[in-house]
Amino acid sequence: MATKGGRDKIKLESTAGTGHFYTTTKNKKTMPEKMSIIKFDPKARKHVEYKEMKLK
């Protein structure tokens, strides 16, 4: 049986205001700051910045 890791689920939400988001995991011990990454937004049909938000 797998053990629980130190990774937490997070939501990366588009800053374009389309409401599109990606979910991923990150290790909060090695990366305590909020994640920001440029990914493709299919609703805006261009690459935009995605910022980490709370996963409800």
UniProtKB/Swiss-Prot annotation:
Residues 1-12 have a biased composition (Basic and acidic residues). Transmembrane segments: none annotated. Gene3D superfamilies: Ribosomal protein L33. It holds the Pfam family Ribosomal_L33. InterPro entries: Ribosomal_bL33 (IPR001705), Ribosomal_bL33_CS (IPR018264), Ribosomal_bL33_sf (IPR038584), Ribosomal_zn-bd (IPR011332). It comes from the Bacteria. Residues 1-24 are annotated as: Disordered. GO terms for cellular component: cytosolic large ribosomal subunit. Keywords: Ribonucleoprotein, Ribosomal protein. GO terms for molecular function: structural constituent of ribosome. Residues 15-24 have a biased composition (Polar residues). One of its GO terms (biological process) is translation. The keyword Ribonucleoprotein applies. Belongs to the bacterial ribosomal protein bL33 family. PANTHER family: 54S RIBOSOMAL PROTEIN L39, MITOCHONDRIAL (PTHR15238), LARGE RIBOSOMAL SUBUNIT PROTEIN BL33M (PTHR15238:SF1). This is Large ribosomal subunit protein bL33. It comes from Paracidovorax citrulli (strain AAC00-1). The lineage of its organism: Bacteria, Pseudomonadati, Pseudomonadota, Betaproteobacteria, Burkholderiales.
